[in-house]
Structure formats: structure tokens, C-alpha cells
Amino acid sequence: MTTLNSYSIAERINSDVNARVTYKSDLEQFDTPEFWTMAGKFGDCEDYALSKRNALLNAGWSKDKLGLCVCYTQSGEGHCVLWVETDKGSFILDNNYAFPMKPSELPYRWESMLCDGVWQQLHGFA
């Protein structure tokens, strides 16, 4: 989906999921360092990203316009966000930001992306 209002849909879903989910690490929730699942009431970064991806797929988005990105924050912590292709270009949906952000606007070191079932290294992504 890259229809005329796809950015607005992505913005709404980002806001809805960020408001609905309270951050809680996998260690706190599941007693394991990593457990990828869609967020219920609680979740960590990849759970937010998976929930946003699922909501966009349900809204008619094509899988090839969505990607789960693994990156590192300025402090070196692993982080996961959702890349989306919209009518206004490529944006990142991140649980740390209220609005979709351009990859170049974020202080992350990009590592890899899962898009349409294939992991790929990210070089020069931002």
C-alpha cells in the first residue's frame, strides 16, 4: 500500500500502539532475554514493532512495504523498529517517538532488516 493517505494511516497506528502498550522488557515479562511476540498490554521494542506491522498488514499494507529493523542506540543497546514505505517516502515507526521519523533523523546505527521474510544487512540506510 502506498495510497494517497498511507502516511496518515502509519502515523495513526504508530500513535495507537505507542499509547496502548506499556514498555516492559522480555526479562521482566517472560524471564528470558529475548522473546519476540506482538504486544498485549506490555511489550518491549520488537513487540511494539511486530504489533505495528500486524496492524498495517490488517489495514491492507503489502509485506514488501514493511520491514523490521534491528539497530543500536547511541548507548550501544540493541533496538528494533518498523520501517514503512508510505506515500510520503520511507519512515520509521519507533516506540520512542510519537511520530513517524525519517531514518536519517534517528541517532541509530542500522544493522539489519527483515523484509518479506528475508534478513538483509543495512549499509547506508539512513
For each feature predicted by the language model, list its residue ranges.
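A structural boundary/capping signal
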Residues: 1-126
